[in-house]
Amino acid sequence: MTRPIDRRSGAGWRSAARRATRLARLGLTAALALIVTPVIALASAPPAPALGNGLALTPPMGWNDWNAYGCNVSEQLVEQTAQAMHNNGMQAAGYQYVNIDDCWMASSRDGSGNLVANSGKFPDGIAAVANYVHSLGLKLGIYEDTGTATCAGYPGSYGHEQQDARLFASWGVDYLKEDWCNIPFGDFSGQSHQQVAQTLYTRMRDALSSTGRPIAFSMCNGWDSSVQPWNWAGPVANLWRTTVDIQPNFTSMLNNFHVNVGLADHAGPGAWNDPDMLEIGNGMTATENQAEFSLWAEMAAPLIEGGNLVNPGSSTLSVLTNKAVIAVDQDSLGKQGTQVSSASGHDVLAKPLANGDVSVVLFNETGSTATISTTASAIGKSGSSGYTLTDLWTGATSTTSGTISASVPAHGAVMYRVAGGTTGGGPASEIHAVGAGKCLDVPNATRTNGTQLQIFDCAGGTGQIWASSGGRLTVYNGAKCLDAYDNQTTAGTKVEIWDCNGGANQQWQVNSNGTITGVQSGLCLDVTGAGTANGTPVELWPCNEGSNQRWTVG
């Protein structure tokens, strides 16, 4: 068995040393970008369409060796971990990927230009490891880099994308994590880091697709904040890093939470924000472990554990295999939870679920126990005199007429599943027109009945903030409803605002394919003529799967 190494002398070097290497290899501009935590609007832009490879329709779940072992990866470690996951309840709980990180390969390619596994670490080769992992019903992941060398200095995929993809497929690899070190920016004169990233990651996407093997694709470049993958990576990868490398302490976990929580608009089935691996059991307290797992699940983040699973300890396993919390992360609606409120280090997050329930996390960032509260209406619930709260960590149930509150320990989280009443699309938010990259907008924020809606640059104004409740889409805190003009049900009917009156022409269905249909007419909310200019009107039109009929809510 591979002995877990001391993080201070072994794997402990990984984030500090890897970041230092990245800084040196990316240059001063990227170094400055890494130091600053980005400030991101809660609804900054519509998500890019998902990759569409049929993979990761819920956030990937698995294990990666790097956080606990660094470069001390081996065939024995990977196979022992796979066997442990098979035996200890993790596989049954939904974990499926066993992922090898950096340092698995030899220091150079062979005479044919192929990557070669380090024979001392992987004497039987990667294909044999894949066969073993597959025999347990699990899947194997591997690591590479978009640059000329990996972050630890091993051969990168730059210029070898097609060759490496074919090799990975021939080995039976199911998941590729591709890093962002040693990028030859000189080959891309005049291009930004983001433009280079788009080019290189798209190359590997296409190479993987051409193999015919389903390989989930994970981009690891969010730590270079100038790349901002959440704005463009939906059609390129199944998940993308949004943050710097996580460390096994509360401060690091909190930083990654702060960066990732504001990116909910960019996540969805097949395309996920990744705030980095879980550090459960790697040094945080039991309370902090529970908080991290709650937050990652609420944010629909990949659940990739980075600890020692051969000897994990019962408390670590109890967190990692909490099926009620995992069910929130894996919910088929595919919504990332959003921040309802955040004041004085007391956070409330809400995540709508496919069956109409809402998951709520009350998170205490501070060093003292605090009472944190919200309401059913604030999390998108309505239409009931009572709601049932299920504590997802204790299993206890309670009822409330509307107030949701708990005493939350320092650095801790309380997580509820709220049932009852009707559920809208969660907290009020912008509605994005996917094809145009603009927002559903009431012109000049007027409140005049009969005003036709348009699309306009997203600015977070009152005429762009919509809430969903009881099948209605409302603006101005419920004062006006989205309305089909004069109860008409024909193509070209204008969509307007009107006083909410319970009419059938004010009932709307937000569909999983991104369309919004009028319940009365069966027609789709449509940007006229597939226009993209500010002021283009919105109408009803027969549904045709056009991008001008796709919207993202919340």
Give the positions of each predicted feature.
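Secretory targeting and sorting signals
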Residues: 2-50
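Structural recognition of the beta-strand scaffold that forms the well-ordered cores
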Residues: 57-65, 94-101, 139-144, 174-179, ...
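Aromatic-lined carbohydrate-binding/catalytic grooves of carbohydrate-active enzymes
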Residues: 81, 85-189
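Aromatic-lined carbohydrate-recognition surfaces of secreted/lumenal glycan-active proteins
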Residues: 138-155, 205-226
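Glycan-recognition surfaces
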Residues: 163, 213-308
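Carbohydrate-binding surface patches
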Residues: 296-299, 304-306, 342-381
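C-terminal beta-strand-rich structural cap/linker in extracellular carbohydrate-active enzymes
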Residues: 400-424
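Extracellular glycan-recognition/adhesion modules and their associated mucin-like linkers
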Residues: 422-447, 462-489, 506-532, 550-554
